[in-house]
Amino acid sequence: MLDREACIVLNMISGVGYVKYTALREAFGSPSAVFGRSAEELRRVSGIGQALAGRIASYEWEKELAAELELADKAGVRILTLFDEGYPDVLRHLYDPPLCLYVRGRLPALPENAVAVVGSRRMSAYGERMTRSIT
């Protein structure tokens, strides 16, 4: 597994954000080195509790990664990770940047001052109305 792929998989696991991703990467040397570890090994990492360690250790990453990449491809979406050249520098330098960005269409250069809408994939009707009102 490439580090880029590991980043996508870790992003898919509930409870893993940038802070826990960083702890795992530092503990094992790279994002790809996280996989294949036992729940016990994972649990020894600061901030990784028993439940999260179990989710990571038992995650069917090959199947889930293939499904995610296929779904993105069918939707015309590119997945940008922290490892990709196209990942915006303005986000890369945040304290807690998103591990992945799902981009449809062209991603213009981001200005220093910008607004982003961050949320779940299934937004509510209210969330959709509010998003449209600021664009």
Say what each PLM segment does.
Residues 1-133:
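Short, positively charged patches
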